């Protein structure tokens, strides 16, 4: 502190005819400047990517490139008790892949949930920022069970896959933005 300074002891010696002053050392301002902004711009970039992906999605829906309605044939591969799910599960076990997640709601209820929640979740993008026709949505009710670490866990989250033939939902544990 300046008030505790004693010339020659903890401050440079003062000369009677010198016009010098002491200034506190504040460190390297560049380090603080960049440290304060670390991570700030990536959040803004993610928001820009989400907006661009949402615009791309609405354009694709309006032009008829993708349909929001549920594709029952694709959804049955994720419907517990259906023959397509059992075949899919058996194929994954033979290949050494994890057991697929499954939905517990019927297709009409899933369809109404998709129509209600479409474009309200997190749209996934590729490395270039282009929308990859998938969206992660919290459906606010248990839609199915995801297979994690050897057991099935009930979940409200689902990844919706959009295509020109319709959508299908794959239950997932949480919103990890993959």
Residue ranges and their predicted role:
Residues 1-67, 143-178:
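Activation/maturation switch segments at domain boundaries
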Residues 58-178:
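Functional cores of ribonucleases/endoribonucleases
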């Amino acid at each position: 502190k300046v008030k505790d300074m004693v010339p020659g002891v903890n401050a440079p010696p003062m000369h009677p005819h010198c016009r010098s002053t002491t200034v506190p050392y504040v460190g390297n301002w560049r380090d603080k400047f960049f440290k304060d902004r670390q991570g700030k711009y990536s959040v803004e970039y993610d928001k820009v990517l989400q907006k661009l992906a949402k615009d791309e999605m609405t354009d694709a829906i309006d032009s008829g490139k993708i349909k929001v309605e549920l594709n029952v044939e694709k959804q049955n591969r994720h419907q517990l008790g259906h023959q397509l799910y059992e075949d899919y599960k058996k194929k994954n076990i033979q290949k050494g892949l994890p057991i697929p997640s499954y939905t517990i709601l019927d297709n009409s209820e899933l369809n109404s949930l998709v129509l209600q929640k479409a474009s309200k979740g997190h749209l996934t993008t590729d490395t270039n920022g282009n929308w990859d026709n998938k969206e992660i949505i919290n459906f606010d009710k248990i839609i199915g069970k995801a297979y994690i670490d050897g057991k099935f866990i009930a979940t409200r989250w689902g990844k919706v896959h959009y295509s020109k033939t319709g959508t299908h939902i794959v239950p997932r544990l949480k919103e990890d933005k993959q």
